[in-house]
Amino acid sequence: MKIKTTILLVLATSALFATSCREKLAEAKSDPLLRAYDSEQDWNNPDRIIPLNYQQAQGKRVFYQYCVWCHADATPAGPSNRSNLNPMPPLANDGAVFNSLSDDFLRNTITLGGSAVGKSGLMPPWGKTLSQEDIDAVIVFYRAIAQPPYQAPAQPGPKYSVR
């Protein structure tokens, strides 16, 4: 009789434990930050954290190595050079500027430099420094942090590319 009681007690405890694990697993699946590869603090709202997938996280890495010096107000080393440039480059999270530009246009701007696409000649061509995968990752990162949030076009526009 003691063995049956012990077995029933162990089974009941195991069932309760399994149920609580399932609840925590369901909770983890619903929280995008727990599934994120990395995150970025919203530049406009410090209380908001933006979850990043792997490609967006790679873009963040490239951004903070090459782009932050002109496309952010602050860098890991202190203030950026942005305010010293004329025309002043847009912030990377400026959805009002970047949301209206196609991925191909951004790709060409990064690859060929600003003057190649009718923008500021102060934007250097990164095509020989960065791989196409890195450039695509930076674009995806910009889209992830854009304020207002980026909405992909329902139908892609005309395509021209350096590829």
Question: Language model features by range: what are they?
Answer:
Residues 17-20:
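C-terminal motif of bacterial Sec signal peptides marking the signal peptidase cleavage site
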Residues 22-24:
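Bacterial signal peptide processing site
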Residues 54, 60-88, 112-121, 144-152:
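Periplasmic/extracellular electron-transfer cofactor-ligation site
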Residues 84-145:
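Extracytoplasmic electron-transfer domains, predominantly the class I c-type cytochrome c fold
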Residues 1-7:
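Bacterial N-terminal signal peptides that target proteins for export
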Residues 57-68, 101-105, 129-132, 154-157:
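Sequence context surrounding c-type heme c attachment/ligation sites in exported
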Residues 26-62, 158-163:
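Electrostatic cytochrome c docking/interface patches
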